[in-house]
Amino acid sequence: MSNWTQADIPDLNGKVAVVTGANSGLGFESTKELARHGATVVMAVRNMEKGEKAEADILKEVPGAKLDLMNLDNADLSSVQAFADAFKQKYDRLDILMNNAGVMAIPRQETADGFEMQLGVNHLAHFALTGLLLGVLTNTPGARVHSVSSSAAFNGQINFDDLMGEEEYSRWAAYGQSKLASPPS
């Protein structure tokens, strides 16, 4: 698999993909390549203004790309629910779910639901999103879920006694914990 490149992506015409965090980094590049190979890509983004710019940039490189910009804030589980509901109203299939959105090594903050931000955004929201979309995923032949992780998972530890980092907080330990929760394959 180490020699696998974008050129190895099969024809994705007729396929639907969701990429969280699609406006920058790995999410942006993945969105571009999935679209280049014919998929309809739902760009799930927290900041719609940045999402619109990313969408325009992709359309410059991949004219005719089938993109659908939708709001998703992984720091708020009500936004995750709203996204899943809106997606299921528009689409009856989901071939690729790429759980990519994330935050890295930030000062301690909490999500709208009171979870430590890195664990909430990097793992819990994606876990919830996958569960909310499981019906459409299982009804789509050959559907795949890919959760982007990090090599930080290899050094991460789950602190079950202080999962939310309320007693002691290290931004890198919290990041490693969030990535270990969704380990690399």
Segments and roles (model prediction):
Residues 2-185:
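Rossmann-fold NAD(P)H-dependent dehydrogenase/reductase core
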